[in-house]
Amino acid sequence: MVKLNFSRELRLLTPIQFKNVFEQPFRASTPEITILARKNNLEHPRLGLTVAKKHLKRAHERNRIKRLVRESFRLSQHRLPAYDFVFVAKNGIGKLDNNTFAQILEKLWQRHIRLAQKS
């Protein structure tokens, strides 16, 4: 049976792990979202989240975005390549409703799957 959890081993936790992704990433982006990725030496993908106060002033808005990204990653993790992903929120992200946001995330995950197959 496939596990659809988001355990500690599926998260980027330390600044060094984030820095590693920021060095030479594959990018997939829209005006509101960028997802950076870099191959890891593990057998599973990992996710890191960055949602700045600059783009979303209120904590409940930042939490909503992070919750939606975690859920999307959790459901897509078995299709994703063994990469470290960093989600970066940009201006205008707060104006997206949940359905539109989920559709955009799905397109970005698909783009990363295609990029991984090419490399």
Curated annotation (Swiss-Prot):
Transmembrane segments: none annotated. Coiled coil: none annotated. It catalyses: Endonucleolytic cleavage of RNA, removing 5'-extranucleotides from tRNA precursor. Disulfide bonds: none annotated. Gene3D superfamilies: 3.30.230.10. InterPro entries: Ribosomal_Su5_D2-typ_SF, Ribsml_uS5_D2-typ_fold_subgr, RNase_P, RNase_P_CS. One of its GO terms (molecular function) is 3'-tRNA processing endoribonuclease activity. Keywords: Endonuclease, Hydrolase, Nuclease, RNA-binding, tRNA processing. Its EC number is 3.1.26.5. One of its GO terms (cellular component) is ribonuclease P complex. The keyword Transmembrane does not apply. It holds the Pfam family Ribonuclease_P. The keyword RNA-binding applies. GO terms for biological process: tRNA 3'-end processing; tRNA 5'-leader removal. Belongs to the RnpA family. Consists of a catalytic RNA component (M1 or rnpB) and a protein subunit. RNaseP catalyzes the removal of the 5'-leader sequence from pre-tRNA to produce the mature 5'-terminus. It can also cleave other RNA substrates such as 4.5S RNA. The protein component plays an auxiliary but essential role in vivo by binding to the 5'-leader sequence and broadening the substrate specificity of the ribozyme. HAMAP family: RNase_P. NCBIfam families: rnpA. This is Ribonuclease P protein component. The gene is rnpA.
